[in-house]
Amino acid sequence: MDISPFASPLYLLAKPAGARCNLACKYCYYLEKGKLYADRPTEVMSEEMLERFVREYIGAQTMPEVLFTWHGGEALMRPLSFYKRAVELQQKYAGGRRIDNCIQTNGTLLTDEWCRFFKEQGWLVGVSIDGPQEFHDEYRRNKGGRPSWAQVMRGIDLLNRHGVEWNALAVVNDFNGDYPLDFYHFFKEIGCHYLQFTPVVERGQHHADGRTLASPTEAGEGGVLDFSVSPEQWGRFLCAIFDEWVREDVGTYFVQLFDATLANWVGQQPGICTLAPTCGHAGAIEWNGDVYVCDHFVFPEYKLGNIMTDSIVGMMHSERQHAFGQAKRTALPGQCRG
């Protein structure tokens, strides 16, 4: 069996609009990343950079399938023409490989035109929605402080009307974490069969550039932030949903964490880095070509390089990236290891 690093797909999550977003969710870990580029706060990925990324990314793959993931910030802050150009470039450089695309959105900017494109091109759409209105609107508001749930539901309705494949990404926090079954039943009621639950846990740390979240190398100031879900909450949340899911919904509704745990249990790859013994195969690329070790580690000390001067293969298979991935096995307490 080939266990070399090149036996696994090489993966970069792309941020074509950087940290730009039309919402200002209180718990967002990425919104403040724009301060890393404070001298160019309104910049987005240029067409030149897009072509460089598509060409280099496809060329770096050793597998017959290539997955592009478009993320944010809010990925729809780039116009539809940008993604149409991305598809043209993917076709130009595919070299016989199959190209798949998925895109993560808060759902508020979806239109008929966007949905027609996603349907025609076979894109998978991930929608960020934190359950029923009273849960979602607690933290997911726009920059003027207005709630966003109604706009998200309008976007989901458009996806359904156009027959676009979509799944939900829901953040579990201190507020909604106490209502697991209300949360779960909501997604069943709106016909969402693929769910990803993400616990939010952030620590505060003030930086000279205005950022307020601690990086993994920093101790943090005053413990976790108030919107964070507690360990006990998260455990009760998962157990309550699992007890219903395992009795009624296996094979009908797919909860990423449960499926990944089952895969681990039977000796298969879990498919998500949090349950794997090591990580490091999934980096992130910012609008200007900067590459970081991981989407959740976009901090200056975790920058690997830039695709205008460094190869994707060289960065993602570097000793530094390997050490980052192995640290999950060597540096974490035993209880936290995959």
Predicted regions and their residues:
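Conserved alpha-helical substructure of the radical SAM core
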Residues: 1-116, 121
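Local cysteine-cluster metal-coordination motifs and their immediate loop/turn environment
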Residues: 20-31, 293-296, 333-338
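Conserved AdoMet/S-adenosylmethionine-binding subsite of the radical SAM
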Residues: 55, 59, 77-195, 203-204
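Radical SAM enzyme [4Fe-4S]-AdoMet core and its adjacent flexible, acidic
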Residues: 140-150, 157, 161-274, 278, ...
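Membrane-interface junctions of multi-pass transporters
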Residues: 270, 298-338
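Short, acidic, Ser/Thr-enriched surface-loop or helix-capping motifs
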Residues: 286
